[in-house]
């Protein structure tokens, strides 16, 4: 079974980085309602589009998701 996206994303945290994955990781870490136990693209994407307490470029999210799938 694949690690959840959130678990993988937390390994990408780096407050000193300007890389999109590090920025998303920090934003997700601060968002208590971010879906933490899923590896489903649609669920995470829908959350970012409709419910996130922050704004993030969804084009960058697509690339981050591809990186997640590659690991």
UniProtKB/Swiss-Prot annotation:
One Pfam family from the record: YozE_SAM_like
Parts forming coiled coils: none
InterPro entries: UPF0346, YozE_SAM-like, YozE_SAM-like_sf
Family: Belongs to the UPF0346 family.
NCBIfam families, sorted: PRK13672.1
Protein name per its UniProtKB record: UPF0346 protein stu0441
Organism: Streptococcus thermophilus (strain ATCC BAA-250 / LMG 18311)
